[in-house]
Amino acid sequence: MQGRLSAWLAKHRLVHRSLGFDYQGIETLQIKPEDWHSIAVILYVYGYNYLRSQCAYDVAPGGLLASVYHLTRIQYGVDQPEEVCIKVFAPRRNPRIPSVFWIWKSADFQERESYDMLGISYDNHPRLKRILMPESWIGWPLRKDYIAPNFYEIQDAH
């Protein structure tokens, strides 16, 4: 079953794949990394001007990494928001996805956290660096193949 946004994207020949609907009836779409930036701009102009959240996860050990965007469009009133979930999958070896910081400023810390925990590089992000882990940390702690170090250095908070 194709949702309203998926039908609109198909009508305008914008490449995507419908992944169905979640339990709340929110449409989920898959976008290729190379198409993500242009489609993100189109979605913003179309009215999806609120990035509710961005997160990332490791699909499977040795598999793809996913960056997930929850977008909201309020056209008919705040009590009737139109929402969509966008998933962008990237290869584990060199996970690169265009940053949407310049479209939705709220992506700033969220993309940095995804970089810090999973190692996804968000191209053209102005401050892409670790946000939770120390700069000297080696590895990506939320990857399923991450091996935790045997010790942790306690640092003075002063």
From Swiss-Prot:
GO terms of biological process kind: photosynthesis, light reaction
Catalytic activity, as annotated: a plastoquinone + NADH + (n+1) H(+)(in) = a plastoquinol + NAD(+) + n H(+)(out); a plastoquinone + NADPH + (n+1) H(+)(in) = a plastoquinol + NADP(+) + n H(+)(out)
Alphabetized GO MF terms: NADH dehydrogenase (ubiquinone) activity; quinone binding
Pfam family, one: Complex1_30kDa
Subcellular location, record wording: Plastid, Chloroplast thylakoid membrane
Superkingdom of source: Eukaryota
Record membrane topology: Peripheral membrane protein
EC numbers on record: 7.1.1.-
Annotated signal sequence range: none
InterPro entries recorded: NADH_DH_suC (IPR010218), NADH_quin_OxRdtase_su_C/D-like (IPR037232), NADH_UbQ_OxRdtase_30kDa_su (IPR001268), NADH_UbQ_OxRdtase_CS (IPR020396)
GO cellular component, one term: chloroplast thylakoid membrane
Entry-linked PROSITE patterns: COMPLEX1_30K (PS00542)
Top enzyme category: translocase
Keyword tags: Chloroplast, Membrane, NAD, NADP, Plastid, Plastoquinone, Quinone, Thylakoid, Translocase, Transport
Description of how the protein assembles with itself and partners: NDH is composed of at least 16 different subunits, 5 of which are encoded in the nucleus.
Family the entry assigns: Belongs to the complex I 30 kDa subunit family.
Function: NDH shuttles electrons from NAD(P)H:plastoquinone, via FMN and iron-sulfur (Fe-S) centers, to quinones in the photosynthetic chain and possibly in a chloroplast respiratory chain. The immediate electron acceptor for the enzyme in this species is believed to be plastoquinone. Couples the redox reaction to proton translocation, and thus conserves the redox energy in a proton gradient.
HAMAP family hit by this protein: NDH1_NuoC
Protein known as: NAD(P)H-quinone oxidoreductase subunit J, chloroplastic
Organism whose genome encodes this protein: Ranunculus macranthus (Large buttercup)
